[in-house]
Amino acid sequence: MIRYLFISVLIFIISCSDKKQPVDISVIRDSINAISTNKKMVKIDSGSYQAFYGKDSGNIVRVKAFYLDETAVTNAEYLKFLKANPQWTRNNVLRLKADENYLKNWKSDFEIPEGVSPDAPVTNVSWFAAVAYAKSVGKRLPTVDEWEFAALADEHTANASLKPEFTAYILNSYQKKYKYKKPVKQNRPNYYGLYDMYGVVWEWTEDFSSVMMTRESRNDKSENEGLYCAAGALTSSDLRNYAAFMRFALRGSIQANYCINNLGFRCAKDID
């Protein structure tokens, strides 16, 4: 637990030292060729949860019903996207939209990494790339609130946040290494039918850069410095906060063009 606290505080310091502007999804103006997908999505019914970040911390947030992919996007699925949209291959992508680590382990533009399952989550992809993929399949990335709300579920209940064993499972899953090389669906699904919300890869969200802002300032796109840094007042007695803090610290410390070895994504969709 001390190691977790150290890692969290380290990321927290990095995130608080970086004045970030929220990323505007409208910057993705490239022409994207659509691809077909038969990936199963599950319905997440509307509800509420206790938010963790900024001035929303401790507040009850309402989440509308939405659809969410049952698994993270896989290497095979992303390869199909690349073949239809070669401007997003490793050798063609703009550095503005993906750093030098983009798909760094792929053997070539159209060959997935050696020793990694085609059905494993694609990683080393930027937020821009994830948004482009989602656009190609007629979807979007989930919001922070949607992801956090869906991730409250264990195998049996929609909200397991008060179960000590669930918190222990989450924290333990964060210690596992190289899970991103294995196929999805290796663990049992949660209450909704979602696989691998923990312990395989971290996942991009549409509004990941909003963690340093209040809900009000997110709405008007204005900057609000230091609000997220108030999370440093977390007490060591609340393990649930540690788990949430690790996720929000990561989101607060990355930029949209970052590509990380264990960071992938899954897609969401509005309910018409």
Language-model features: where?
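Sec-dependent signal peptide recognition
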Residues: 2-7
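Functional-site microenvironments in short loops/helix caps that host divalent-cation chemistry
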Residues: 50, 108-252, 256, 261
